[in-house]
From Swiss-Prot:
Cofactor remark: Binds 2 magnesium or manganese ions per subunit.
GO biological process per UniProt: cell wall organization; peptidoglycan biosynthetic process; regulation of cell shape
Binding sites annotated in the UniProt record for Mg(2+) 2: 306, 308
Disulfide bonds: none
CC annotations in GO: cytosol
Name of the protein described by the UniProt record: D-alanine--D-alanine ligase
Residues of the ATP-grasp domain: 134-339
Catalysed transformations (reactions): 2 D-alanine + ATP = D-alanyl-D-alanine + ADP + phosphate + H(+)
Name of the coding gene: ddl
EC code: 6.3.2.4
Pathway stated in the Swiss-Prot or TrEMBL entry: Cell wall biogenesis; peptidoglycan biosynthesis
PANTHER family in the record: D-ALANINE--D-ALANINE LIGASE, D-ALANINE--D-ALANINE LIGASE A
Binding-site residues, Mg(2+) 1: 293, 306
Length: 356
């Protein structure tokens, strides 16, 4: 049987650029190259698109994926011309953060009518924006912790009023987050007003909108979701930290985080978490994959924290580990995601685009 053509896209104009490259290395080394002919497209920090065809060997040096010697190409040509001359069975965007995980590149795929792995424009954009995501969860009745959100322009004009609002509505510690970033980039844990001001300034370096959330003493529990219209969920896993805050460095660089899979939880709590993860998936009209993150208190109160529409596939990642625990290997998970992308594209072709 002939190999299917797959294009993996990574890098991107985002603060999570390096995380994306790590994810690409992991996927390239795990994908079944007997079944797929794999081309890669690297998007530089400046937005240039560079392509390398027919990757047959594992990638040992992650920096080799930066494709510094490759010339920039025309985007539409790169996406529509595979190394074999056949159309791509699917493109696999491994882009994290703005300009990749937020619906922008998904819109490009839709315009070009390409099958692609993961969430569509609506789901990607709504799960990327923490405020919109929280509003959709509230509409679905999913329990959340109190929060405050505001724009950079509002803070510049009404700083004292906003700080008062935060102190009136929330108690220290609080977490300050850019609304449109993941991997804990730009996030600060703040224990007092001075740290709050500093955290706000830090977050506004990455986004024009931020969310400040109530801190809580709780376990951090995550559930993986996979599917299209009828999603499946995993047993929950737990993030066990050697640090006070699970930030970018501890996630990807230091290895100061351990994953406990499955998490030690009552069966009733596990069932509730899995049901809530599926509800979160449906609330934002997801397809392909999603990771849902929760807080579980000592007395088993459950709060949804956020969802991640493109969880990383690095060696520290929870998402593939949760499916491994369910009996689905990393390579088979990648294959399943490609099949879901093709399924979603076939479903889309049933739509009429003209009136007879």
């Amino acid at each position: 049987m002939a190999k299917e053509n797959i294009c993996i896209i990574y890098g991107g104009k985002s603060a999570e650029h390096d995380v994306s490259i790590l994810t690409a290395q992991n996927v390239l080394n795990a994908i079944n190259k007997d079944d797929y002919q794999v081309d890669i497209i690297y998007i530089t920090n400046d937005g240039a698109w560079k392509k390398k065809d027919d990757i047959t060997e594992n990638v040992e040096d992650v920096d080799s994926l930066r494709l510094e010697e490759v010339e920039e190409g025309e985007i539409s040509n790169l996406l529509t011309n595979s190394s074999s001359g056949q159309p791509y069975a699917a493109v696999f965007p491994l882009l994290h953060g703005p300009n990749g995980e937020d619906g922008t590149i998904q819109g490009l795929f839709e315009v070009l009518d390409l099958p692609y792995v993961g969430n569509g424009v609506l789901a990607a954009s709504s799960t990327m924006d923490k405020l919109v995501m929280k509003q959709l969860f509230a509409h679905r009745g999913l329990p959340q912790l109190p929060y405050v959100s505001f724009l950079r322009s509002e803070y510049e004009k009404y700083q004292s009023n906003i700080l008062k609002l935060v102190k009136d509505k929330l108690e220290f510690p609080v977490f300050v987050k850019p609304a449109n970033l993941g991997s804990s980039v730009g996030i600060s844990k703040c224990n007092n007003e001075e740290e709050l001001k500093s955290g706000i300034e830090e977050a506004f370096q990455f986004d024009r909108k931020l969310v400040i959330e109530q801190g809580i003493e709780a376990r951090e529990i995550e559930v993986a979701v996979l599917g299209n219209d009828y999603p499946e969920t995993t047993q929950p896993g737990e993030v066990v930290k050697d640090v006070a805050f699970y930030d970018y460095k501890s996630k990807y660089l230091d290895g100061k985080v351990q994953l406990s899979i499955p998490a030690e939880l009552d069966s009733e709590v596990q069932t509730t978490l899995r049901n809530m993860a599926a509800e979160a998936f449906k609330a934002t009209d997801c397809s392909g994959l999603l990771r849902a993150d929760f807080f579980v208190t000592e007395d088993n109160q459950i709060f949804i924290n956020e969802t991640n529409a493109m969880p990383g596939f690095t060696q520290y990642s929870m998402y593939p580990s949760l499916w491994e625990n369910m009996g689905l290997s990393y390579a088979d998970l990648i294959t399943k995601l490609i099949e879901l992308a093709k399924e979603k594209h076939v479903e889309k072709q049933k739509n009429k685009y003209k009136i007879d």
